[in-house]
Amino acid sequence: MLPAPSSDYPERQARRALIHGVYAITADEGDTARLLADVEAALSGGIRILQYRNKHADIALKRQQLEALKPVCERHQTLLIVNDDWRLAAELGIKAVHLGEDDGDIEEARQALGPGSLIGVSCYASVERAQALAPVADYLAFGALFASGTKPLARPAPLSVFREVQALSLARPLVGIGGIDADNIGSVLD
């Protein structure tokens, strides 16, 4: 059964329009000062979308790091997206999250985050998952496009998945993740 479509709100449409260009994902960094320095450098270099992802941190460290990142992202006018933990995002007033298949119900997350929230979903290499989630998601992510040191067991997704999904005219931004670097980014952007 397909999820019920959710209403579009101007704030949500504006956030969705931000999903383009290079999208940075933080490293699993335990040192908040080092994380902030790395993020500051990336944002000063032009990154306008940042996903906070720290699979090794406990909830206290995640909260501390997000509280520190939020004003940095606001100062740089960068969209801050929280990976996995929509409850923590809601607690901190962050309106954007990225959810994998085991991260909870999208509609429950949207209700907690508010109607203007932005929710991206991992589709891995599944065109069917993209089609099923497009009515309730704001962007669709595919990957790992390349081998990744941070997620060595990630499911591979061929670049051809983008053409397949674009042919469906789902009207959602598409995001490629996993192992993208200076050597292969050209093939992703093509």
Feature map (PLM): residue ranges:
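Conserved N-terminal beta1-alpha1 strand-loop-helix module at the mouth
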Residues: M1-I106, Q111-Y139, A154-S160, E164-L174, ...
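A short, flexible beta-alpha/helix-coil linker loop
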Residues: F146-S148
